[in-house]
Each structure stands twice: as structure tokens, then as C-alpha cells.
Amino acid sequence: MNNERKIIDSVETLESALASLKDAEKKFSTYTQEQVDKIFLAAASAANKARIPLAKMAVEETGMGVVEDKVIKNNYAAEYIYNAYKNTKTCGIIEEDKAYGIKKIAEPVGVIAAVIPTTNPTSTAIFKCLLALKTRNAIIISPHPRAKKSTAAAAKVVLDAAVKAGAPEGIIEWIDTPSLEMTNLVMKEADIILATGGPGMVKAAYSSGKPAVGVGAGNTPAIIDDTADIVLAVNSIIHSKTFDNGMICASEQSVIVHQNVYDAVKTEFAARGCYFLDPEETEKVRKTILINGALNAKIVGQSAFRIAELAGVTVPEGTKILIGEVESVDLSEEFAHEKLSPVLAMYKAEDIHDAFSKAEQLIADGGYGHTSSIYLNEITEHEKLDEFSARMKTCRILVNTPSSHGGIGDLYNFKLAPSLTLGCGSWGGNSVSENVGVKHLINIKTVAERRENMLWFRAPEKVYIKKGCLPVALDELKNIMGKKRAFIVTDNFLYKNGYTKPITDKLDEMGIVHATFGDVAPDPTLQCAEKGVEQMRAFEPDTIIALGGGSAMDAAKIMWVLYEHPEADFMDMAMRFIDIRKRVYTFPKMGEKAYFIAIPTSAGTGSEVTPFAVITDETTGIKYPLADYQLMPNMAIVDTDFHMSAPRGLTAASGIDAVTHALEAYASVMATDYTDGLAKQALKVIFDYLPRAYENGQTDVEAREKMANAATMAGMAFANAFLGVCHSMAHKLGAYHHLPHGVANALMIEEVLRFNAAEAPAKMGTFPQYDHPHTLARYAEVADSLGLGGKNDKEKLENLIKAINELKERVGIKKTIKDYGIDEKYFLDTLDEMTENAFDDQCTGANPRYPLMSEIKQMYLNAYYGKKHFEEKPMPTEADIAEDDSAHNFKQAYRRAENGKNKA
């Protein structure tokens, strides 16, 4: 060392030392891993070489412990700590995953305040100094007054070796004349406190206002089961309890013995040099263990013979442990406390459960979080071990192991980190519940690079298209799959009007037994699905055929789930998610009982190729869109024969529904090149052929077939890109006001297009690939694909909206919600609730503009009254209608605002 170290014996010298220490740490924090590892090796080697003189000094100064055992402690602190962490990265990049864009960088915490106990003054100092050096931290030691010289000597050995190996001078410091005032100052000025010692000191560390890593009180119980190897158990406990005269905090304080082996255990203890106190002697030792309710410092680390002398009890000089046979596990029993000496309480247990109860009480009274121990046949008694592990509130549960050696780690086990600071978790008032190591003394910076989600395109295994394809597609049920029982789900109209006959005729031809549920109503309810699944369970089909529009197919999907998994909870299935792959609820695997075929009879819903189903809770009227790829049909049969006689109203509503499917899929934050192509082509076909299908009906086969294909393509697009807030609002509009789903979408789509097209939205959608608001440009692309013209994106949007409105008009869709006869007062009365439910709809998450509830409410109002532009005209404020919140006055306020008489 170039500079002679200055003695720290006052607050002034301490403050000066702390300033120098911080400078040293700042320099040390720039060292490379190679430099640090060189210093770490040199310091550990020096400490190991000084193990004997340091042990002698500790015993001489404190008058506690056994020199030979302290040699082992010092050796352990140097050798085992070095071995455990010699290859551990603690500088710079310690972990990197380039594929996921994650990098972890280790930084030192700064200055460590280390509180050192009198029980292990040199080994703990070595341990903490080595951890500090490995993690590029500076450390200042506050020794116990009874062990200040030996603690300082240990620190100096490590410091000198570290500086010689290249560490900054003064990187390790210690208080030469410790006092409470200086210890408190150290804890106040440090960046982290590493506290090992009595409960008072540890509590002070945690109360200092600085991060602290500490220990808790130990009161280790050791249970000996009647299946235990008695020789192993007894000698392990003796070995542990006598190690350094019992001053390891994990050492056994009580032994609880099954009554079946109690005498044998007692005999073995006695044979190995332990002394059983008689009742009179037990009482004398009781009075020696505690003085005024606290542990008698005079017995700590003393030999059994010396403690017996203090108690006025005569025992052989070589006695290893004083054992008191006691019954109470309460705090009133002195033997039930932590003793830090070769004094042991011994209890008789009626059975293993009684032993567990006694151990629980001993831990609760003085050793929460620390250590517990059990001896048993771990091969045959795993149930006992499991119960012991479950019941003991300790962070170290040792099996067939001397707890002093086992608790500190890596001696009698090889995955418990070596340490002389044993965390006790929240049970022991600690922040750490494991053996303290280098990871607790570094700050880890995580560098997370932006990554876009893996995307996908998923569709039914088989999609059959073309007029008249039904019988050919169904052939597979017999010829390829060997199916025998088919259950058809449809609505009452289709059933009564013979739509199921082509299916049943083909099934009869193939010899496949069939049954039909024909009671699906529009907006199917959970009650309807449960009624259908009851019949399904009785019939036990291996094939389910859904025939109809969205209602029939959605109801059939729900029945399919309830049939295969009756334990499934509907509310769990309806739980919202942000990412379908990370959802809280995992959908059960489908298709194990029945193969699912979907056959649409209208061109719009797309349910035949989607993982979605909408079901209504009949008790609340709320529609729940369910989403999971387990709901994807196995086969879709798009046969135009089923579409030919669709009435005009259905043709119009379902056709505009398909328009909104394609538009929302194209604008979705999850849109891909695959879904874009399907969406744009679907829109082009619909604009060309929906008017013909509407006007010509069953005489225009081409128009019907084109519409059938367009609806299915739009379905494939939104099956993968998902939908948006238009559908969220339409779901609730239909639920509250019983508008057909396609009509509800038609009424909201203009508002949503304008809403999404904002270049500076209040909030944009959350998805990695959606990096900035660009929906206006997306809508312009749609306009271009439809050949609508426009000089810029805004003009193109207006042309797109105009074309959609003209299309709606051609197929008989009215302009406003009000035009459909929805009562104004009821609409306004339900508006807030409807708004919140729309916001919470599963479809909202993929919308490119994340909507505020106030914005959803505004769109509903605009769609009700026919307001054309979302931002153009102000809505009435709360103050405008504060005097009277009736629907009438709300309406008047709205009109005043529109007329510019009452500017909001």
C-alpha cells in the first residue's frame, strides 16, 4: 500500500474514511471481470493462508469458541466462497439473449456497510469482504466491540492481498473503535447494509432507511423419526452442536424424538459423551441460560463443562453437550430458547405429528424463517418429509444433516449456496429468504430491445368451396374418418324449411346415424347452448355439424365445448385477454370427442373459419365474444346452394357485416400481409356483388357465390388479425337494443372509420408491430384498391366512407340508430353502461386507436343522432345538461350545441 491507513476512532475520521471509500468504489466500478477475478483469487488465497492465526486471535480476543473449528470457518469462508463464485459473472454483461433482445448488465451497489458478529468475527469478515470484491463494491466493517481486533485483522489480510493484486487502495475499511454512533453513521451513509448479528442490530439495519440484507434469529429444532438411522442422527447433531461450541446460528437448539426410539436415542447420546441433566441439574442450567429474560452472554460459545460450572453442576470434563429433558415448548421454558452453546433441549413426541407441532411452536417462538431439521428414512417416508416441508416456516429445511454445517451450505449438500449470512425471508423480518451471495450485492440493469410478436395465419384444416360441394365434402366422414354419429345444430327456420335435408340425406346414404337440434334463436343464449348440449350428451356424437348463420354456428361451438368439457366455466372462457397466447384462462383441447363442421347459410358472419363465438348471458343480456383457436372448426363447407334463398334483409345485414370484418381486419394492429390480401379482395368482391345479390336474389348464382367466398375470406382475415371497436360497439348495441348484428355494425362503421383515422389520437393501440398511427393511410389503401380515387389520404377516406354509405343505402340500411325506432330515453339511460361494456369487449384490444370510454360514448351519440363528423361539432358538456338530465333536455342541449348556440 502506498498510503498508510488512518485509524477510524471518531465520527470525524469515519466521515473522512467514507469519502475515500466512495472514491475507491467509483474507481473499482470500472474494473473488468478479468481484473476482479484476479483480485478475488488473491484475496481468497491470502485469507485461507491466514486461517490459523486469525482463528487463534478470535478465540483469544472473545474468549468464545474453539480454535480448531474457527480454523475450519476461516478456511470455509475463503475456499468455499471462492469456489462457488470464481466463474460467476459480476461485471458488465452477465447474460444475453440476442434472439429475444435481452441483455443483463451487472453493476456494483456501491458501499456496503457490514455488521460483524462476535460469534464469527474473522470468518464473517472474510466472507463479506470477498463478496464485496467479487461484486466491485467497497465495504466498511463495523465489528463487535468484543471482537474488533480480530475482525480488523481479517479485513486487513483481505485488503492487503486485494490491493497487491490491483484493487484500489482503501477499498476495504473498518472501524477501529466501534460505537453505536459510528455504526449508525455507517449504516446511514452506505448504499446497502449486510447485517449479521443479534436481532437488535439486524432490526437497526432494516430501520436505517437504507436497503439491508440481514439474518433472523435461529432456534433450530431437529426431529428424529422412528424410521431414522439413530447412530447417524445422534452423531450428526453432536457434530453440529459442538462445532465452535454451538455458535453457528443454524445449530440445533432442541431435539424432538419419536417415543418409539426415545430411549435408543438417549442411549446413543450418552454413549457419545453427552450428559443428561437430572431434574435438579436441569433447573440450575435453566437459570444459567437466561438472565432477566435474555440469553446469558457468559454461556455463548463456551464448552459444556464450563457452562455446567457456571450453573453449579458437576459433569465430566470432556462432556460434549448438556441435555435437558423438558416438556414445554413455550417461551416460559428456558431450554426452548436459542442458546448458542452446547446446551440442548430434548423432547419426547407421541408421534410424528406431535413432533411437527412441537417444532412449529419452537420456530414460532424464536426461529421463524431460519432453519429446521429432520432425520428419517427419506426413501420410504416421503409423505412425512412433504408434510414437514409444508409445515415448517423456515427457509432451510435440512434432511439427515448436521444443521450447523448443512445450513451454511455446500458442505453436506451441493446446491445450497455457501454463506455465513443466512436470510430468513419475511418470516424472520428479512428481505432475502436464501443464503446470501453475490447476486444480492449487485444491481442488474436489463436492456430490453424492441421485438415484434410472432404472427400467424390459422384456418380450419379443410375449407371446401363451390356450389354443390356439400355431398363431396361430407364423403370424408365415412371414407376417410370413419365417423358414425352426427349431431346437427341449426335454427328453427332452417330446420322447418328443409335446409337440413341435403345433409341428412347424405348422412343416411353413408349410414351415419344423426340427430338434430333446431332451436337456436337469434342472439343465442347460454341457456340455449346448455339445452342443446344436454341432447348432445344423450346422443354422443362423434361429429357436430353447425348449419346456419353466425347464431347457429356460435351456439354449436359453445355446445361443442360443453360437450367435450362439461367442467369448463363459461365466465372463465369469456375472460378478456391482451395476447391470446398469454391469456389467464387456457381453453381445453377440443376435438377429442367430436369433429366440428361449419356450414354457413348466409354470406357475412365468417364464423365457419374463425376461432370466435358470441353468446348472450340471458340473465344480463350481455353478449360475450369468446376467442380461442380451440374454437376453430375442423372443416368449413361453403356451398352456395345454402345461400340462394336468403332474404333481402339478411343479405344486406350479413353483407355489411362482412364489409366491417374486412375493414377492421385491415386496420387492426395485428394485420399481416396474409390478412391484408384477403381483406382487400373480400371488400372488392362485396362492393361488386352485394348489390346484385340483394337485388337479384336466387336468380344470380354468380353474385351469391362471390358473396359467399368474400364473407369467408373476410372471416379468415379477422380470424387472424382480429376485429376492432366497431364490433365492440355493435355487440352491445345488439344486446341492449336488439338490432341485428350486421345492422349494428353498419350503423357504427362510419363513426369508427373517422375515429380510427385520427393522426394524433388520444391513445394508439398497443402491439409491437403497430409503431405509429397510420390508419388513415391504411383506409386510403382500401380506397385505392376499390378504385375510388382521391388526391390525398383524407380525400380517399371521404370517398371510402361515401362508397360505404352508398352501398348501405342500396341494400336498404338506414342511416341512424334512431331511424330503427330505438327509444331515445332508453338509449340515453343505457348509454353509460353500454359504453363501459363496449370498452371491455374482447374486440377493443386490436383496434388501432385505443378508445377512451368518453370517445365510445360520443360515437354512440353520433350514430344515434346522425352526426357526420367525430370532431366537427361539440357535444353538450355536463354543465349544459346539469339543470335537467332528462332525455328531452339532453336532446335539446345536443341540438343547441350542433347549432352553435352553446359552444362546449
Per-segment meaning from a language model:
Residues 2-103, 131, 271:
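N-terminal Rossmann-like NAD(P)+-binding subdomain of aldehyde/semialdehyde dehydrogenases
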Residues 3, 29, 313-453:
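Conserved C-terminal structural/oligomerization subdomain of aldehyde/semialdehyde dehydrogenase
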Residues 8-11, 126, 202-330, 357, ...:
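ALDH superfamily catalytic-core signature
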Residues 89, 154, 527-641:
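Glycine/threonine-rich beta-strand-loop-alpha-helix active-site module
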Residues 93-232:
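Rossmann-like NAD(P) dinucleotide-binding subdomain of oxidoreductase/dehydrogenase enzymes
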Residues 263, 271, 609-721:
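Carboxylate- and glycine-rich phosphate/diphosphate-binding segment that chelates Mg2+/Mn2+
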Residues 455-543, 817-818:
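ATP/NTP phosphate-donor binding region
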Residues 736-827, 845, 869-870, 874-878, ...:
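Gly/Pro-rich interdomain helix-loop hinge
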